[in-house]
């Protein structure tokens, strides 16, 4: 696989030299593919060198910064990993949703979970996201209990009304619902949840292909970086606003 990506890099560079267009974004992604393979084989130092090359072609490549954090964490440097993951906000605020769980896990690892929650709440206020809310919700539930977790979801739903948010609110309410009201809430949850899941898709801006998970390269049209880091329903709400 590494040889394939290196050939892709050489081909893209040749196209650029011939004046056929700019391929900086693609070349950076090819380097990320190599680095990801290096991380799988526990070659963190090699991955860091490869990711530096990726950023030399595209300094705003979010994936490269996320993988730098992964490599640093693999080397046991949690503080440096946290710094790398926090830089994602400087590159693209909406993409912090993709790195939220890494950040929360990192802050737990260094014994500063509340600092992590505070940071993620700040991100949530800047770039509402159901994926980001999910991470913050679980952390608040763990640190402060169901009442605070309920309040968090309720506030977010008022600010960004989506079916996905309503589904999360019902889940939160179920946690401390009295026995006599739990059956009805569970029924509502199953009904809302079935519709919400249909909207919980990432959508390619190039070909419209929808997927349950986020892709750096669309499996439908092979375009790079064509997925917004938000679910389709959230994008619809933003466009209406």
Predicted regions and their residues:
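TPR-repeat structural position
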Residues: 2-5, 44, 78, 113, ...
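Start-of-helix register in tetratricopeptide repeats
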Residues: 22-25, 29, 46-49, 63, ...
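Residue at a conserved register position within TPR or TPR-like alpha-solenoid repeats
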Residues: 31, 38, 72, 107, ...
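Conserved structural position within tetratricopeptide repeats
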Residues: 14-17, 52-56, 87-90, 124-125, ...
């Amino acid at each position: 696989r590494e040889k394939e990506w290196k050939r892709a890099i050489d081909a893209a560079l040749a196209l650029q030299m011939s004046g056929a267009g700019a391929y900086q974004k693609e070349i950076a992604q090819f380097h990320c593919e190599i680095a990801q393979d290096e991380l799988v084989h526990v070659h963190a130092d090699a991955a860091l060198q490869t990711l530096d090359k990726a950023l030399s072609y595209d300094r705003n490549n979010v994936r490269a910064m996320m993988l730098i954090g992964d490599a640093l964490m693999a080397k046991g440097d949690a503080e440096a990993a946290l710094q790398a993951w926090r830089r994602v906000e400087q590159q693209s605020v909406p993409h912090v949703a993709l790195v939220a769980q890494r950040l929360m896990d990192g802050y737990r690892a260094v014994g500063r979970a509340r600092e992590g929650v505070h940071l993620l709440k700040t991100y949530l206020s800047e770039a509402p996201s159901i994926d980001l809310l999910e991470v913050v919700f679980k952390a608040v539930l763990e640190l402060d209990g169901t009442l605070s977790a309920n309040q968090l979801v309720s506030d977010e739903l008022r600010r960004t009304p989506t079916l996905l948010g309503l589904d999360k609110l019902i889940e939160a309410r179920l946690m401390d619902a009295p026995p006599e009201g739990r059956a009805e809430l569970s029924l509502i949850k199953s009904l809302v949840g079935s519709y919400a899941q249909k909207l919980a898709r990432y959508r390619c801006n190039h070909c419209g292909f929808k997927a349950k998970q986020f892709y750096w390269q669309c499996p439908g049209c092979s375009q790079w970086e064509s997925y917004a880091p938000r679910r389709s329903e959230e994008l619809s709400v933003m466009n209406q606003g």
